[in-house]
Regions:
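Hydrophobic transmembrane alpha-helices of multi-pass small-molecule transporters
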Residues: 1-20, 24-25, 147-249
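Alpha-helical transmembrane segments and their membrane-interface exit regions
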Residues: 3-6, 26-37, 86-88, 138-148, ...
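Membrane-embedded alpha-helical segments and adjacent helix-loop junctions characteristic
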Residues: 10-86, 219-302
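Alpha-helical transmembrane segments
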Residues: 18-32, 63-67, 129-142, 189-205, ...
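Helix-loop-helix module between adjacent transmembrane segments
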Residues: 64-73, 101-109, 282-283, 316-322
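Membrane-interfacial helix-loop connectors
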Residues: 80-93, 117-129, 267-323, 335-337
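Membrane-core helix-loop-helix motifs of multi-pass transport proteins
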Residues: 89-173, 331-362
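Juxtamembrane boundary at the C-terminal end of a transmembrane helix
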Residues: 361-372
């Protein structure tokens, strides 16, 4: 990022220090706001002591649970479920795939994900309803493919089958309420950004629930999180701050090189090529946020359709994370549970091409229905 800004300055283009310092402020605000939800969504004592269910139903409960739970509170959902599914201190292949794939599939549609906020930074005016309608079928496909890969039909699904997490509907009450509030507000006031709405509602809803459940003790817990626990997400926040610096550098570099662009327009074919490049970069070890920042900044002069661009970038994240060995999710799984990061690449080798093909089809379908 610094090198790009220097290249721009040497070519007579002033460095965009404002973009470098504040480019991802709204995204960082969202990550901090969503972190408060952990105070009201952690499993209760009954769930922690409940026997683990088995079989095909347990598999789907776990898949849907990590997907819907993770759609709101992000990566802590994976660790909450994984810690409970440990067997003799180890997390099996099937459980690891269910948790990581089910979580990553949220990125196709969830407005609470950093991926969506990062994409919306480069696509103001995107229509959330269309993005969600495009992403939900892809998320459903991802869950179905995962179930096929992990549900061994030759086993007795009531006995030796998948050992899952005892997920209950009450666990999803707060995330579901937040989804309803955000979507309802966006429908009433579409000019208000999704990131702003989530950043406002997440801590407010958390505070209301804490006061209702615990009274003054809940207020102390809320204040304690604000004063002492927000720093727990510092590595992720630094990553997005660095991405803002990178965006400023790319802007300066483009100005220095005469603004050379990869395409002359941004339609479904260009969107598909962008998606393939993001996933290829992730496979080589580039974090999706860097790829999204690069392409979002690079394509901005084309004034691409914001909805198509946001769908493309979120798909790139949803597929790029399971494709890449160095994603934060896979590195965390290795550090906490001893699963080699390259094992995920091997396990997902057939899964990724199927999702890519479906996503490219979805991009073309969205563009065709909207006359792009």
């Amino acid at each position: 990022g610094v090198a790009g800004m220097l290249a721009g300055v040497l070519s007579g283009v002033p460095a965009d220090l404002r973009l470098a310092a504040t480019g991802n402020q709204t995204l960082i605000g969202l990550l901090c706001a969503v972190s408060f939800l952990r105070l009201v969504t952690m499993p209760d004592a009954q769930t922690r002591s409940e026997a683990l269910p088995r079989g095909r139903t347990a598999l789907w409960r776990t898949l849907l649970g990590v997907h819907l739970f993770g759609a709101v509170i992000n990566i802590p959902a994976v660790f909450i479920l994984a810690d409970r599914l440990l067997r003799n201190g180890r997390l099996g292949r099937r459980a690891a795939l269910v948790l990581t794939r089910g979580f990553c599939a949220c990125t196709f549609w969830s407005p609470f994900f950093a991926a969506m906020a990062a994409a919306l930074n480069f696509a103001p005016g995107a229509r959330l309803g269309i993005i969600i309608l495009t992403g939900l079928p892809l998320a459903a496909l991802a869950l179905w493919l995962t179930a096929l890969d992990t549900d061994d039909g030759r086993r007795d699904t009531r006995g030796a089958g998948f050992v899952g997490y005892p997920m209950h509907l009450r666990t999803l009450a707060v995330p579901g309420t937040l989804v309803g509030l955000v979507l309802g507000t966006h429908l009433l006031w579409p000019q208000t950004g999704i990131t702003t709405i989530v950043t406002l509602y997440a801590p407010l809803l958390c505070l209301v629930v804490l006061l209702g459940r615990r009274g003054r003790a809940g207020l102390h817990a809320f204040a304690g999180h604000a004063l002492r626990r927000l720093g727990d997400g510092a590595p992720e926040l630094v990553l997005f701050l660095a991405a803002g610096l990178l965006a400023a550098g790319i802007t300066g570099l483009l100005a220095a090189t005469g603004g050379q662009l990869p395409f002359v327009r941004f339609g479904p074919i260009e969107a598909s090529l962008t998606l393939l490049l993001i996933v290829a970069a992730a496979f080589a070890g580039v974090h999706p946020v860097i790829a999204i920042t690069t392409f979002g900044t690079w394509l901005a002069p084309l004034a691409p359709d914001p909805t198509l661009l946001t769908s493309t970038l979120t798909m790139g994240w949803a597929i790029g994370v399971p494709a890449g060995p160095l994603s934060g999710l896979h590195l965390s799984m290795q550090g906490r549970y001893g699963i080699p990061v390259f094992a995920f690449q091997r396990w997902n080798s057939r899964y990724i091409p199927k999702l890519l093909a479906a996503s490219i089809l979805a991009l073309h379908l969205q563009a065709a229905l909207r006359g792009l």
